[in-house]
Amino acid sequence: MKTIFKSGVLAAAAVVLSAGLVAPVFARDLTVVSWGGNYQDAQRNIYFKPFSEKIGKPVLDEAWDGGIGVIQSKVKAGAPNWDAVQVEAEELALGCADGLYEKIDWDKMGGKDKFLDSAVNDCGVGAIVWSTAIAYDGDKLKEGPTSWADFWNVEKFPGKRSLRKGPKYTLEFALLADGVSKDEIYDVLGTEEGVARAFKKLDELKPNIVWWESGAQPLQFLASGEVAMTSAYNGRITGINRSEGKNFKVVFPGSIYAVDSWVVLKDAENKDAAQDFIAFASLPENQAKLPEFVAYGLPNKEAASKVPADFSKDLPTDSANMTDAISLNVDFWIDNAETLTQRFNAWLAQ
């Protein structure tokens, strides 16, 4: 149907032009981009569809896998076909510095004081607080791991492990497994000796690692029994527990948390509507619905107080879950991602 419609439009335009008339301009619908999976399914129900009904116009949504290069290519080519995009912290910092995003109208958002400090940026509005943590199947492991040292212990907990295929998170977890305290992780990783120490620890586990590249894969690996435990996004784990009745467990001590943000691409056709959408998605009464579907923390401070206790206990921002968690050091990864990625890839190929 899409092909037929486009062909008809082109034919009509050709007739108009041949008659010496100006061809009509067809406005593109507001397009919102997020991370896919059960998280985007929840967003569709909580944000996308209700906002579409509110404005009386379609809202399209697409999924992506991240990467500042994707946004750079769209913006620098002119007339980007995305409007509001959810980005990770590094993409927010790099894109804002590079002029890839519109400035946020914080008055429209209700004011900066409504949000956690880490959710406020000139170019972005915090969308979720999420964690990468240890996960395992509680039906298969009655006494599961409680630390990254346990994750590395294949004698006590036999079976394969899964980690994200890349240096970020993986190197931090290796150092935690080797006994580095959470408060010293980035100080140690900032030295050549610390990097070597992390890779040496990874050497121990390498024969037992199944690498994952998309957020859905850890769930698949656990469900199939291919791995005994994995690193995973906490919201994906609680999401599948609720939607499919799984008994997957999340281990918050030693987890790494970060804030994802909404941005509006520079010169996007629907930039004003995109700001309106972000304001709608940031309302406390709307954000408070998210933990019913996926257990991500909420940047709007009022929203957090509206979440029932049965759901709030699963959030990364719950006080008990934050106790031994680590904040992702965005500046460290902006400065070191390229070098450490090259080193990681070389290590992987050995």
Question: Where on the chain are the PLM-derived regions?
Answer:
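Extracytoplasmic ligand-binding site segments that recognize negatively charged/polar headgroups
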Residues: 37-42, 81-82, 87-223
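Periplasmic-binding protein-like
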Residues: 114, 130-132, 195-204, 242-268, ...
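Early extracytoplasmic/lumenal segment of secretory-pathway proteins
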Residues: 28-95
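Sec/Tat signal peptide C-region and signal peptidase I cleavage site
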Residues: 21-27
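A ligand-binding cleft/hinge motif common to bilobed small-molecule-binding domains
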Residues: 92-94, 229-247
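Mature extracytoplasmic/periplasmic domains
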Residues: 265-325
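A bilobed periplasmic-binding-protein/Venus flytrap-type ligand-binding module shared by bacterial periplasmic
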Residues: 133-140, 175-177, 259-271, 289-293
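Conserved C-terminal helix/tail region of periplasmic/extracytoplasmic solute-binding proteins
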Residues: 322-350
